[in-house]
UniProtKB/Swiss-Prot annotation:
Native source organism of the sequence: Homo sapiens (Human)
UniProt xrefs under CDD domains: STKc_CaMKII
Phosphothreonine modified-residue sites: 287, 306-307
Taxonomy, superkingdom: Eukaryota
UniProt disease link: Intellectual developmental disorder, autosomal dominant 59: An autosomal dominant form of intellectual disability, a disorder characterized by significantly below average general intellectual functioning associated with impairments in adaptive behavior and manifested during the developmental period.
Signal sequence segment: none
Chain residue ranges for the region called Calmodulin-binding: 294-316
Described function: Calcium/calmodulin-dependent protein kinase that functions autonomously after Ca(2+)/calmodulin-binding and autophosphorylation, and is involved in sarcoplasmic reticulum Ca(2+) transport in skeletal muscle and may function in dendritic spine and synapse formation and neuronal plasticity. In slow-twitch muscles, is involved in regulation of sarcoplasmic reticulum (SR) Ca(2+) transport and in fast-twitch muscle participates in the control of Ca(2+) release from the SR through phosphorylation of the ryanodine receptor-coupling factor triadin.
GO molecular function: ATP binding; calcium-dependent protein serine/threonine phosphatase activity; calcium/calmodulin-dependent protein kinase activity; calmodulin binding; identical protein binding; protein homodimerization activity; protein serine kinase activity
Coiled-coil portions: none
Protein name per Swiss-Prot or TrEMBL: Calcium/calmodulin-dependent protein kinase type II subunit gamma
Gene of this entry: CAMK2G
Protein backbone atom coordinates (compact mmCIF):
# COMPACT_ATOMS: atom_id res chain seq x y z
CA UNK A 1 0.00 0.00 0.00
CA UNK A 2 1.30 3.44 -0.90
CA UNK A 3 2.11 5.55 2.14
CA UNK A 4 3.29 9.09 2.72
CA UNK A 5 6.16 9.62 5.13
CA UNK A 6 7.87 12.85 6.06
CA UNK A 7 10.19 11.50 8.75
CA UNK A 8 11.80 8.57 6.93
CA UNK A 9 14.57 9.36 4.53
CA UNK A 10 14.22 7.79 1.10
CA UNK A 11 17.81 6.56 1.16
CA UNK A 12 17.14 4.57 4.34
CA UNK A 13 14.74 2.31 2.45
CA UNK A 14 15.91 2.47 -1.16
CA UNK A 15 19.14 2.33 -3.13
CA UNK A 16 19.30 4.49 -6.25
CA UNK A 17 20.73 3.38 -9.58
CA UNK A 18 20.83 4.71 -13.15
CA UNK A 19 18.74 7.52 -14.56
CA UNK A 20 15.74 6.49 -16.66
CA UNK A 21 14.38 9.88 -17.66
CA UNK A 22 14.35 13.57 -16.84
CA UNK A 23 11.89 16.47 -16.70
CA UNK A 24 12.14 20.17 -15.94
CA UNK A 25 11.97 19.71 -12.16
CA UNK A 26 12.29 15.95 -11.76
CA UNK A 27 14.38 12.94 -12.64
CA UNK A 28 13.37 9.27 -12.78
CA UNK A 29 15.89 6.70 -11.58
CA UNK A 30 15.81 2.95 -11.04
CA UNK A 31 15.84 2.03 -7.38
CA UNK A 32 15.81 -1.12 -5.27
CA UNK A 33 14.04 -1.54 -1.95
CA UNK A 34 16.66 -2.74 0.50
CA UNK A 35 14.41 -5.07 2.47
CA UNK A 36 13.01 -6.96 -0.53
CA UNK A 37 15.46 -6.27 -3.43
CA UNK A 38 12.38 -5.40 -5.50
CA UNK A 39 13.06 -2.96 -8.35
CA UNK A 40 11.06 0.25 -8.78
CA UNK A 41 11.20 3.55 -10.64
CA UNK A 42 11.67 6.59 -8.40
CA UNK A 43 10.41 9.96 -9.62
CA UNK A 44 12.51 12.49 -7.71
CA UNK A 45 11.04 16.00 -7.64
CA UNK A 46 13.15 18.98 -6.63
CA UNK A 47 10.59 20.75 -4.46
CA UNK A 48 12.88 23.75 -3.91
CA UNK A 49 12.15 24.81 -7.48
CA UNK A 50 8.38 24.38 -7.27
CA UNK A 51 5.87 27.18 -6.95
CA UNK A 52 2.96 26.94 -4.52
CA UNK A 53 0.75 25.87 -7.43
CA UNK A 54 3.26 23.19 -8.44
CA UNK A 55 3.27 21.88 -4.87
CA UNK A 56 -0.50 21.53 -5.07
CA UNK A 57 -0.19 19.62 -8.35
CA UNK A 58 2.40 17.27 -6.82
CA UNK A 59 0.13 16.57 -3.86
CA UNK A 60 -2.78 15.98 -6.25
CA UNK A 61 -0.76 13.53 -8.36
CA UNK A 62 0.35 11.54 -5.30
CA UNK A 63 -3.18 11.51 -3.87
CA UNK A 64 -4.65 10.27 -7.14
CA UNK A 65 -1.99 7.62 -7.76
CA UNK A 66 -2.49 6.17 -4.27
CA UNK A 67 -6.12 5.45 -5.17
CA UNK A 68 -5.39 3.49 -8.33
CA UNK A 69 -4.56 -0.21 -8.19
CA UNK A 70 -5.08 -1.94 -11.53
CA UNK A 71 -2.93 -4.27 -13.70
CA UNK A 72 -3.15 -1.77 -16.59
CA UNK A 73 -2.01 1.24 -14.57
CA UNK A 74 1.52 2.06 -13.41
CA UNK A 75 1.14 1.76 -9.65
CA UNK A 76 2.46 4.10 -6.99
CA UNK A 77 4.05 2.14 -4.13
CA UNK A 78 5.51 4.88 -1.97
CA UNK A 79 5.43 8.65 -1.53
CA UNK A 80 8.20 10.14 0.61
CA UNK A 81 8.81 13.80 1.43
CA UNK A 82 12.21 15.08 2.46
CA UNK A 83 13.70 18.52 2.84
CA UNK A 84 13.96 19.85 -0.70
CA UNK A 85 12.87 16.64 -2.46
CA UNK A 86 9.81 14.45 -2.89
CA UNK A 87 10.07 10.81 -4.00
CA UNK A 88 7.29 8.95 -5.81
CA UNK A 89 8.10 5.23 -6.09
CA UNK A 90 6.33 3.55 -9.02
CA UNK A 91 6.28 0.19 -10.79
CA UNK A 92 9.39 -0.27 -12.92
CA UNK A 93 8.03 -0.80 -16.43
CA UNK A 94 10.68 -2.02 -18.85
CA UNK A 95 8.80 -2.73 -22.07
CA UNK A 96 8.95 0.79 -23.49
CA UNK A 97 6.12 2.50 -25.37
CA UNK A 98 3.29 0.43 -26.81
CA UNK A 99 3.53 2.19 -30.18
CA UNK A 100 7.26 1.44 -30.46
CA UNK A 101 6.61 -2.23 -29.71
CA UNK A 102 3.95 -2.48 -32.41
CA UNK A 103 6.31 -1.37 -35.20
CA UNK A 104 8.83 -4.01 -34.11
CA UNK A 105 6.31 -6.84 -34.46
CA UNK A 106 6.36 -9.23 -37.40
CA UNK A 107 2.58 -9.46 -37.35
CA UNK A 108 -0.01 -6.82 -36.43
CA UNK A 109 -3.72 -6.99 -37.12
CA UNK A 110 -6.99 -5.28 -36.31
CA UNK A 111 -7.49 -7.90 -33.59
CA UNK A 112 -4.19 -6.80 -32.02
CA UNK A 113 -5.42 -3.20 -32.07
CA UNK A 114 -8.60 -4.38 -30.36
CA UNK A 115 -6.55 -6.09 -27.64
CA UNK A 116 -4.54 -2.89 -27.12
CA UNK A 117 -7.56 -0.59 -26.82
CA UNK A 118 -9.26 -3.16 -24.57
CA UNK A 119 -6.46 -2.79 -22.02
CA UNK A 120 -6.45 1.00 -22.37
CA UNK A 121 -10.21 1.10 -21.80
CA UNK A 122 -9.83 -1.15 -18.74
CA UNK A 123 -7.44 1.38 -17.21
CA UNK A 124 -9.69 4.31 -18.13
CA UNK A 125 -12.76 2.56 -16.75
CA UNK A 126 -10.91 1.96 -13.47
CA UNK A 127 -9.91 5.59 -13.01
CA UNK A 128 -13.38 6.79 -13.98
CA UNK A 129 -14.90 4.48 -11.36
CA UNK A 130 -12.71 6.32 -8.85
CA UNK A 131 -13.89 9.69 -10.23
CA UNK A 132 -10.50 10.47 -11.76
CA UNK A 133 -9.98 12.00 -15.22
CA UNK A 134 -6.51 11.50 -16.75
CA UNK A 135 -6.67 14.44 -19.24
CA UNK A 136 -3.47 13.42 -21.07
CA UNK A 137 -4.09 10.09 -22.75
CA UNK A 138 -1.60 9.79 -25.62
CA UNK A 139 0.93 7.25 -27.00
CA UNK A 140 3.78 8.50 -24.80
CA UNK A 141 1.78 7.50 -21.71
CA UNK A 142 0.97 3.97 -22.88
CA UNK A 143 3.76 1.65 -21.74
CA UNK A 144 4.40 -2.09 -21.65
CA UNK A 145 5.12 -3.86 -18.37
CA UNK A 146 8.06 -5.78 -19.86
CA UNK A 147 9.64 -6.81 -23.15
CA UNK A 148 7.97 -10.23 -22.95
CA UNK A 149 5.48 -11.11 -25.66
CA UNK A 150 1.96 -10.29 -24.52
CA UNK A 151 3.10 -7.93 -21.75
CA UNK A 152 0.35 -5.81 -20.24
CA UNK A 153 -0.27 -2.26 -21.44
CA UNK A 154 0.04 0.21 -18.57
CA UNK A 155 -1.30 3.75 -18.38
CA UNK A 156 1.26 6.18 -16.94
CA UNK A 157 1.75 9.83 -15.96
CA UNK A 158 -1.07 11.23 -13.85
CA UNK A 159 0.53 14.66 -13.64
CA UNK A 160 -2.51 16.31 -15.25
CA UNK A 161 -5.14 14.03 -13.70
CA UNK A 162 -7.98 15.61 -11.73
CA UNK A 163 -10.63 14.52 -9.24
CA UNK A 164 -14.26 15.01 -10.31
CA UNK A 165 -17.68 14.64 -8.72
CA UNK A 166 -19.25 11.64 -10.45
CA UNK A 167 -20.62 12.55 -13.87
CA UNK A 168 -20.69 16.25 -13.07
CA UNK A 169 -19.09 18.53 -15.66
CA UNK A 170 -17.00 21.58 -14.70
CA UNK A 171 -14.24 23.78 -16.10
CA UNK A 172 -10.93 22.44 -14.80
CA UNK A 173 -8.66 24.49 -17.05
CA UNK A 174 -7.12 24.08 -20.47
CA UNK A 175 -4.97 20.96 -20.23
CA UNK A 176 -3.79 18.14 -22.46
CA UNK A 177 -1.93 17.54 -25.71
CA UNK A 178 -3.18 19.33 -28.87
CA UNK A 179 -3.95 16.37 -31.13
CA UNK A 180 -5.85 14.57 -28.35
CA UNK A 181 -7.87 17.48 -26.92
CA UNK A 182 -11.65 17.13 -27.01
CA UNK A 183 -14.05 19.66 -28.58
CA UNK A 184 -15.47 20.65 -25.18
CA UNK A 185 -12.02 21.54 -23.83
CA UNK A 186 -11.26 23.62 -26.93
CA UNK A 187 -14.61 25.39 -26.56
CA UNK A 188 -13.78 25.97 -22.87
CA UNK A 189 -17.02 24.28 -21.91
CA UNK A 190 -17.45 22.32 -18.67
CA UNK A 191 -15.98 18.85 -19.09
CA UNK A 192 -15.38 15.56 -17.29
CA UNK A 193 -14.76 11.88 -17.95
CA UNK A 194 -15.75 11.95 -21.66
CA UNK A 195 -12.53 13.84 -22.52
CA UNK A 196 -10.59 10.62 -21.87
CA UNK A 197 -12.87 8.67 -24.21
CA UNK A 198 -12.28 11.21 -26.98
CA UNK A 199 -8.53 10.70 -26.58
CA UNK A 200 -9.09 6.92 -26.70
CA UNK A 201 -10.87 7.42 -30.02
CA UNK A 202 -7.87 9.30 -31.41
CA UNK A 203 -5.54 6.56 -30.16
CA UNK A 204 -7.70 3.80 -31.66
CA UNK A 205 -7.76 5.60 -35.01
CA UNK A 206 -3.94 5.72 -34.98
CA UNK A 207 -3.71 2.06 -33.91
CA UNK A 208 -5.66 1.06 -37.01
CA UNK A 209 -3.96 3.12 -39.74
CA UNK A 210 -0.81 4.65 -38.22
CA UNK A 211 -1.77 8.34 -38.50
CA UNK A 212 -4.14 10.57 -36.48
CA UNK A 213 -7.68 11.62 -37.41
CA UNK A 214 -6.97 15.32 -36.89
CA UNK A 215 -3.77 16.96 -38.09
CA UNK A 216 -2.49 20.28 -39.36
CA UNK A 217 0.75 22.22 -39.08
CA UNK A 218 -1.29 25.22 -37.92
CA UNK A 219 -2.59 24.60 -34.40
CA UNK A 220 -5.55 26.95 -34.93
CA UNK A 221 -6.66 24.89 -37.96
CA UNK A 222 -6.12 21.68 -35.99
CA UNK A 223 -8.42 22.94 -33.25
CA UNK A 224 -11.06 23.93 -35.82
CA UNK A 225 -10.98 20.36 -37.19
CA UNK A 226 -11.41 18.88 -33.73
CA UNK A 227 -14.27 21.19 -32.74
CA UNK A 228 -16.06 20.30 -35.99
CA UNK A 229 -15.32 16.58 -35.62
CA UNK A 230 -13.86 16.76 -39.13
CA UNK A 231 -12.34 13.32 -39.66
CA UNK A 232 -13.04 10.58 -42.18
CA UNK A 233 -12.05 7.05 -43.18
CA UNK A 234 -10.19 7.52 -46.49
CA UNK A 235 -9.43 4.81 -49.02
CA UNK A 236 -7.58 2.60 -49.46
CA UNK A 237 -6.28 2.07 -45.92
CA UNK A 238 -9.71 2.16 -44.28
CA UNK A 239 -11.31 -0.17 -46.84
CA UNK A 240 -9.85 -3.17 -45.01
CA UNK A 241 -11.02 -2.05 -41.55
CA UNK A 242 -14.21 -3.71 -40.32
CA UNK A 243 -17.40 -1.63 -39.94
CA UNK A 244 -17.50 -2.52 -36.25
CA UNK A 245 -14.13 -0.83 -35.64
CA UNK A 246 -15.29 2.32 -37.44
CA UNK A 247 -18.50 2.26 -35.43
CA UNK A 248 -16.57 2.26 -32.15
CA UNK A 249 -14.40 5.15 -33.32
CA UNK A 250 -17.50 7.12 -34.32
CA UNK A 251 -19.01 6.58 -30.87
CA UNK A 252 -15.77 7.69 -29.20
CA UNK A 253 -15.31 10.74 -31.44
CA UNK A 254 -18.83 12.05 -30.90
CA UNK A 255 -18.72 15.85 -30.53
CA UNK A 256 -21.42 15.98 -27.87
CA UNK A 257 -19.83 14.56 -24.69
CA UNK A 258 -23.25 13.63 -23.29
CA UNK A 259 -23.77 11.27 -26.25
CA UNK A 260 -20.21 9.94 -26.30
CA UNK A 261 -19.76 6.28 -25.38
CA UNK A 262 -18.44 5.60 -21.85
CA UNK A 263 -15.48 3.38 -20.98
CA UNK A 264 -17.79 0.74 -19.52
CA UNK A 265 -19.98 0.76 -22.65
CA UNK A 266 -16.94 0.62 -24.94
CA UNK A 267 -15.67 -2.47 -23.13
CA UNK A 268 -18.96 -4.16 -24.04
CA UNK A 269 -18.72 -3.19 -27.72
CA UNK A 270 -18.57 -6.34 -29.92
CA UNK A 271 -15.33 -5.24 -31.60
CA UNK A 272 -13.68 -5.16 -28.16
CA UNK A 273 -15.25 -8.02 -26.22
CA UNK A 274 -15.72 -10.40 -29.18
CA UNK A 275 -12.60 -9.58 -31.16
CA UNK A 276 -11.82 -13.22 -32.05
CA UNK A 277 -14.92 -13.32 -34.24
CA UNK A 278 -15.50 -9.64 -35.08
CA UNK A 279 -12.07 -8.04 -35.61
CA UNK A 280 -10.07 -8.82 -38.74
CA UNK A 281 -6.93 -10.97 -38.41
CA UNK A 282 -5.32 -9.63 -41.60
CA UNK A 283 -1.77 -8.33 -41.19
CA UNK A 284 -1.69 -4.54 -41.59
CA UNK A 285 1.76 -3.80 -43.01
CA UNK A 286 0.82 -0.31 -44.21
CA UNK A 287 -0.32 0.56 -40.70
CA UNK A 288 3.02 -0.56 -39.27
CA UNK A 289 4.94 1.52 -41.80
CA UNK A 290 2.81 4.62 -41.19
CA UNK A 291 3.05 4.15 -37.44
CA UNK A 292 6.83 3.95 -37.67
CA UNK A 293 6.88 7.38 -39.33
CA UNK A 294 4.38 8.72 -36.81
CA UNK A 295 6.62 7.51 -33.96
CA UNK A 296 9.71 9.08 -35.50
CA UNK A 297 7.96 12.43 -35.77
CA UNK A 298 6.85 12.25 -32.14
CA UNK A 299 10.41 11.50 -31.03
CA UNK A 300 11.75 14.44 -33.02
CA UNK A 301 9.37 16.83 -31.28
CA UNK A 302 10.34 15.39 -27.92
CA UNK A 303 14.04 15.77 -28.71
CA UNK A 304 13.52 19.41 -29.68
CA UNK A 305 11.67 20.18 -26.46
CA UNK A 306 14.35 18.45 -24.39
CA UNK A 307 17.05 20.38 -26.22
CA UNK A 308 15.25 23.63 -25.44
CA UNK A 309 15.56 22.83 -21.74
CA UNK A 310 19.25 22.04 -22.18
CA UNK A 311 19.73 25.25 -24.14
CA UNK A 312 18.11 27.26 -21.35
CA UNK A 313 20.66 25.81 -18.96
CA UNK A 314 23.42 27.02 -21.29
CA UNK A 315 21.88 30.48 -21.70
CA UNK A 316 18.59 31.24 -20.00
CA UNK A 317 18.06 34.37 -22.05
CA UNK A 318 18.40 32.63 -25.41
CA UNK A 319 15.79 29.87 -25.36
CA UNK A 320 13.66 30.46 -28.44
CA UNK A 321 12.50 27.66 -30.72
CA UNK A 322 12.40 28.76 -34.35
CA UNK A 323 9.90 26.63 -36.23
CA UNK A 324 9.93 28.43 -39.57
CA UNK A 325 9.88 26.33 -42.73
CA UNK A 326 13.16 25.02 -44.12
CA UNK A 327 11.98 25.11 -47.73
CA UNK A 328 13.99 27.43 -49.92
CA UNK A 329 17.45 26.80 -48.51
CA UNK A 330 19.73 27.56 -51.42
CA UNK A 331 22.62 25.59 -52.81
CA UNK A 332 25.83 26.16 -50.88
CA UNK A 333 29.48 25.91 -51.72
CA UNK A 334 31.00 22.95 -49.92
CA UNK A 335 33.20 19.94 -50.47
CA UNK A 336 30.14 17.80 -51.15
CA UNK A 337 27.72 17.80 -54.04
CA UNK A 338 24.39 19.36 -53.14
CA UNK A 339 21.25 18.80 -55.20
CA UNK A 340 17.90 20.33 -54.27
CA UNK A 341 14.58 18.79 -55.25
CA UNK A 342 11.50 20.99 -55.82
CA UNK A 343 9.62 21.78 -52.65
CA UNK A 344 6.57 19.60 -52.16
CA UNK A 345 3.34 20.58 -50.48
CA UNK A 346 3.52 17.59 -48.18
CA UNK A 347 3.37 18.61 -44.54
CA UNK A 348 5.17 15.61 -43.12
CA UNK A 349 8.01 14.76 -45.48
CA UNK A 350 10.28 14.38 -42.51
CA UNK A 351 11.16 10.80 -41.71
CA UNK A 352 10.81 7.39 -43.26
CA UNK A 353 11.30 3.86 -41.91
CA UNK A 354 14.60 2.05 -42.19
CA UNK A 355 14.46 -0.79 -44.69
CA UNK A 356 17.91 -2.37 -44.45
CA UNK A 357 20.74 -2.54 -41.93
CA UNK A 358 23.40 0.12 -42.19
CA UNK A 359 26.21 -0.83 -44.59
CA UNK A 360 29.59 -2.03 -43.43
CA UNK A 361 31.51 -0.31 -46.21
CA UNK A 362 33.05 3.17 -46.41
CA UNK A 363 34.75 5.03 -49.23
CA UNK A 364 38.03 6.66 -50.16
CA UNK A 365 36.18 9.53 -51.86
CA UNK A 366 32.77 9.76 -50.23
CA UNK A 367 30.08 11.99 -51.61
CA UNK A 368 27.18 13.57 -49.76
CA UNK A 369 24.03 14.86 -51.42
CA UNK A 370 21.48 17.01 -49.60
CA UNK A 371 17.89 16.83 -50.87
CA UNK A 372 15.24 19.13 -49.40
CA UNK A 373 11.53 18.37 -49.08
CA UNK A 374 11.33 15.13 -51.03
CA UNK A 375 7.79 13.85 -51.28
CA UNK A 376 6.98 11.32 -48.62
CA UNK A 377 3.28 10.81 -49.09
CA UNK A 378 2.43 9.97 -45.49
CA UNK A 379 -0.38 11.68 -43.63
CA UNK A 380 1.06 13.81 -40.88
CA UNK A 381 0.23 15.04 -37.44
CA UNK A 382 0.40 18.53 -36.08
CA UNK A 383 3.72 20.06 -35.16
CA UNK A 384 2.55 20.17 -31.57
CA UNK A 385 1.36 16.59 -31.47
CA UNK A 386 3.21 15.50 -28.34
CA UNK A 387 3.46 18.71 -26.33
CA UNK A 388 1.42 18.62 -23.14
CA UNK A 389 -0.27 21.84 -22.09
CA UNK A 390 -1.85 22.81 -18.78
CA UNK A 391 -3.22 26.28 -18.19
CA UNK A 392 -5.76 26.59 -15.44
CA UNK A 393 -5.77 30.37 -15.90
CA UNK A 394 -7.69 29.95 -19.16
CA UNK A 395 -4.83 31.10 -21.37
CA UNK A 396 -4.35 27.88 -23.27
CA UNK A 397 -5.72 28.83 -26.65
CA UNK A 398 -3.81 30.18 -29.59
CA UNK A 399 -5.28 33.54 -30.67
CA UNK A 400 -7.34 33.58 -33.83
CA UNK A 401 -5.26 33.25 -36.95
CA UNK A 402 -2.06 32.60 -35.05
CA UNK A 403 -0.08 29.44 -35.69
CA UNK A 404 1.32 27.27 -32.92
CA UNK A 405 4.68 27.82 -34.55
CA UNK A 406 4.52 31.46 -33.46
CA UNK A 407 4.42 30.42 -29.83
CA UNK A 408 7.53 29.98 -27.73
CA UNK A 409 8.39 27.81 -24.79
CA UNK A 410 8.16 29.54 -21.42
CA UNK A 411 11.42 31.02 -20.26
CA UNK A 412 12.63 33.43 -17.64
CA UNK A 413 13.94 35.88 -20.21
CA UNK A 414 13.47 35.41 -23.92
CA UNK A 415 15.09 37.41 -26.68
CA UNK A 416 13.34 38.46 -29.90
CA UNK A 417 13.22 35.81 -32.59
CA UNK A 418 16.20 35.90 -34.97
CA UNK A 419 15.55 37.50 -38.34
CA UNK A 420 14.49 35.26 -41.19
CA UNK A 421 17.77 35.94 -43.00
CA UNK A 422 19.99 35.05 -40.05
CA UNK A 423 17.84 32.02 -39.31
CA UNK A 424 18.24 30.73 -42.87
CA UNK A 425 22.00 31.24 -42.67
CA UNK A 426 22.12 29.36 -39.37
CA UNK A 427 20.19 26.46 -40.86
CA UNK A 428 22.60 26.26 -43.80
CA UNK A 429 25.46 26.27 -41.32
CA UNK A 430 23.96 23.35 -39.38
CA UNK A 431 23.33 21.33 -42.55
CA UNK A 432 26.91 21.91 -43.68
CA UNK A 433 28.49 20.87 -40.37
CA UNK A 434 26.29 17.76 -40.32
CA UNK A 435 27.46 16.97 -43.83
CA UNK A 436 31.10 17.36 -42.74
CA UNK A 437 30.57 15.03 -39.80
CA UNK A 438 29.14 12.31 -42.05
CA UNK A 439 32.06 12.73 -44.44
CA UNK A 440 34.48 12.23 -41.54
CA UNK A 441 32.74 8.95 -40.77
CA UNK A 442 32.76 7.84 -44.41
CA UNK A 443 36.48 8.63 -44.56
CA UNK A 444 37.16 6.73 -41.34
CA UNK A 445 38.77 9.92 -40.00
CA UNK A 446 38.37 9.65 -36.23
CA UNK A 447 40.47 12.76 -35.62
CA UNK A 448 38.18 14.90 -37.77
CA UNK A 449 35.17 13.25 -36.14
CA UNK A 450 36.32 14.12 -32.61
CA UNK A 451 36.86 17.75 -33.60
CA UNK A 452 33.18 18.04 -34.56
CA UNK A 453 31.74 16.08 -31.62
CA UNK A 454 31.54 17.00 -27.96
CA UNK A 455 33.72 14.66 -25.83
CA UNK A 456 30.61 13.81 -23.82
CA UNK A 457 28.48 13.04 -26.91
CA UNK A 458 25.40 11.02 -25.97
CA UNK A 459 23.68 8.77 -28.47
CA UNK A 460 20.92 6.26 -29.00
CA UNK A 461 21.81 4.06 -31.96
CA UNK A 462 21.07 0.52 -33.13
CA UNK A 463 24.59 -0.71 -32.36
CA UNK A 464 24.10 0.17 -28.69
CA UNK A 465 21.03 -2.11 -28.57
CA UNK A 466 18.75 0.52 -27.08
CA UNK A 467 21.21 1.79 -24.49
CA UNK A 468 22.31 5.40 -24.07
CA UNK A 469 26.00 5.68 -24.96
CA UNK A 470 28.12 8.53 -23.61
CA UNK A 471 31.59 9.54 -24.78
CA UNK A 472 33.75 8.61 -27.77
CA UNK A 473 35.14 5.17 -26.89
CA UNK A 474 32.14 3.29 -28.28
CA UNK A 475 32.50 5.04 -31.65
CA UNK A 476 36.30 4.78 -31.69
CA UNK A 477 36.06 0.98 -31.82
CA UNK A 478 34.26 1.13 -35.18
CA UNK A 479 36.61 3.72 -36.60
CA UNK A 480 39.68 1.64 -35.72
CA UNK A 481 38.34 -1.77 -36.68
CA UNK A 482 36.06 -1.08 -39.62
CA UNK A 483 35.67 2.39 -41.04
CA UNK A 484 39.34 3.19 -41.59
CA UNK A 485 40.08 -0.20 -43.22
CA UNK A 486 37.53 -0.12 -46.01
CA UNK A 487 38.09 1.40 -49.45
CA UNK A 488 34.93 0.56 -51.39
CA UNK A 489 32.91 3.45 -52.86
CA UNK A 490 30.11 5.00 -50.86
CA UNK A 491 27.66 7.83 -51.49
CA UNK A 492 25.46 9.43 -48.85
CA UNK A 493 22.29 11.40 -49.55
CA UNK A 494 20.71 13.56 -46.85
CA UNK A 495 16.98 13.83 -47.53
CA UNK A 496 14.68 16.53 -46.13
CA UNK A 497 17.00 18.15 -43.59
CA UNK A 498 14.79 19.98 -41.09
CA UNK A 499 16.68 22.39 -38.84
CA UNK A 500 15.19 23.91 -35.70
CA UNK A 501 17.21 26.86 -34.41
CA UNK A 502 17.19 27.04 -30.61
CA UNK A 503 18.45 30.42 -29.49
CA UNK A 504 21.87 31.64 -30.60
CA UNK A 505 23.97 28.64 -29.62
CA UNK A 506 21.90 25.50 -30.16
CA UNK A 507 20.10 23.75 -33.00
CA UNK A 508 18.52 20.42 -33.83
CA UNK A 509 18.56 18.77 -37.26
CA UNK A 510 16.49 15.80 -38.39
CA UNK A 511 16.92 14.07 -41.73
CA UNK A 512 16.66 10.82 -43.65
CA UNK A 513 20.01 9.33 -44.62
CA UNK A 514 20.35 7.17 -47.71
CA UNK A 515 23.66 5.37 -48.15
CA UNK A 516 24.69 3.72 -51.42
CA UNK A 517 27.48 1.17 -51.08
CA UNK A 518 28.96 -2.00 -52.54
CA UNK A 519 28.29 -5.19 -50.59
CA UNK A 520 30.63 -8.13 -50.08
CA UNK A 521 29.57 -9.68 -53.40
CA UNK A 522 30.29 -6.49 -55.30
CA UNK A 523 26.64 -5.57 -55.76
CA UNK A 524 25.36 -1.99 -55.25
CA UNK A 525 23.07 -1.58 -52.26
CA UNK A 526 21.15 1.21 -50.52
CA UNK A 527 20.34 1.50 -46.83
CA UNK A 528 18.23 4.06 -45.00
CA UNK A 529 18.16 5.50 -41.50
CA UNK A 530 16.36 8.36 -39.76
CA UNK A 531 18.67 10.54 -37.71
CA UNK A 532 18.43 13.48 -35.33
CA UNK A 533 21.43 15.50 -34.14
CA UNK A 534 21.58 18.19 -31.50
CA UNK A 535 24.28 20.83 -31.96
CA UNK A 536 25.67 23.31 -29.42
CA UNK A 537 28.04 26.16 -30.21
CA UNK A 538 30.92 26.79 -27.81
CA UNK A 539 33.52 29.48 -28.41
CA UNK A 540 32.18 29.98 -31.92
CA UNK A 541 32.49 26.28 -32.81
CA UNK A 542 29.58 23.89 -33.42
CA UNK A 543 29.78 20.55 -31.60
CA UNK A 544 27.46 17.55 -31.89
CA UNK A 545 26.23 16.88 -28.34
CA UNK A 546 23.50 14.28 -28.97
CA UNK A 547 22.63 11.85 -31.74
CA UNK A 548 19.65 9.54 -32.32
CA UNK A 549 19.43 6.99 -35.13
CA UNK A 550 16.87 4.37 -36.15
CA UNK A 551 17.51 1.07 -37.86
CA UNK A 552 18.85 -2.42 -37.17
CA UNK A 553 22.25 -3.05 -35.53
CA UNK A 554 25.06 -3.08 -38.06
CA UNK A 555 27.97 -0.69 -38.42
CA UNK A 556 27.41 2.77 -36.96
CA UNK A 557 26.53 5.61 -39.28
CA UNK A 558 27.00 8.41 -36.81
Amino acid sequence: MATTATCTRFTDDYQLFEELGKGAFSVVRRCVKKTSTQEYAAKIINTKKLSARDHQKLEREARICRLLKHPNIVRLHDSISEEGFHYLVFDLVTGGELFEDIVAREYYSEADASHCIHQILESVNHIHQHDIVHRDLKPENLLLASKCKGAAVKLADFGLAIEVQGEQQAWFGFAGTPGYLSPEVLRKDPYGKPVDIWACGVILYILLVGYPPFWDEDQHKLYQQIKAGAYDFPSPEWDTVTPEAKNLINQMLTINPAKRITADQALKHPWVCQRSTVASMMHRQETVECLRKFNARRKLKGAILTTMLVSRNFSAAKSLLNKKSDGGVKKRKSSSSVHLMPQSNNKNSLVSPAQEPAPLQTAMEPQTTVVHNATDGIKGSTESCNTTTEDEDLKGRVPEGRSSRDRTAPSAGMQPQPSLCSSAMRKQEIIKITEQLIEAINNGDFEAYTKICDPGLTSFEPEALGNLVEGMDFHKFYFENLLSKNSKPIHTTILNPHVHVIGEDAACIAYIRLTQYIDGQGRPRTSQSEETRVWHRRDGKWLNVHYHCSGAPAAPLQ
